[in-house]
Amino acid sequence: EDLFLGFDDHAYEAAFEEVRKGAQRFQTFRDQLVPQISEELFLSIITEYEHYTRILSRLFGFSQLAFAADTQDQAAQAQVARVTQFYAEIDNQTMFFSLWWKALDNENAERLLKASGDFHYWLVAMRNFKAFTLSEAEEKIINIKDVTGVNALNMLYESITNRYLFKVEIDGELKELTRGEVTALVREPDPDLRERAYQALFKVYEGDAPILGKIYQAIVRD
């Protein structure tokens, strides 16, 4: 399915509204999530979940692609921040389902898994995080914190490093390359070219070592 024509595309704004309405509908299922839930109702609930999360993923993917194409584009930066915030808000509104599913007893979980069809792998993977899941209130706080914490730091890092240009000698000619282009060279079969590519990367990154180091430390400590 295509993404969007641009940030001014009517379909782009309409997608936000469709996700909002989908999340609102999904919240009406909360009281129906009981251990003895029928397979039919369970499938209808996760199908509804899939519908609006697919649209949300399109929004997220489109904003990220626009940002990756030009990390200095302020419109793209603003939309990445907007979609990231929106994603966290929707996730907080519908988090109750994943928490319920992780906490469900094994017998009923197995019963529902047998009827889950294409959702089977996703549901199994979700339960693998049971031991690392906090309370709903705590998980919501982490979601909100990440918007202005690690996610913002990652975007700052990308904005800084994607501006870099690297000088590498190729076939006797000194060429100026982008980060993506020079990164591709580190997988070339020619060992000398790989070495020059790595040296070019390290030389440029070293120039911003203090600020990049601070970003790394902040992400690790977050």
Functional labels for PLM-detected ranges:
Residues 1-222:
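A well-structured
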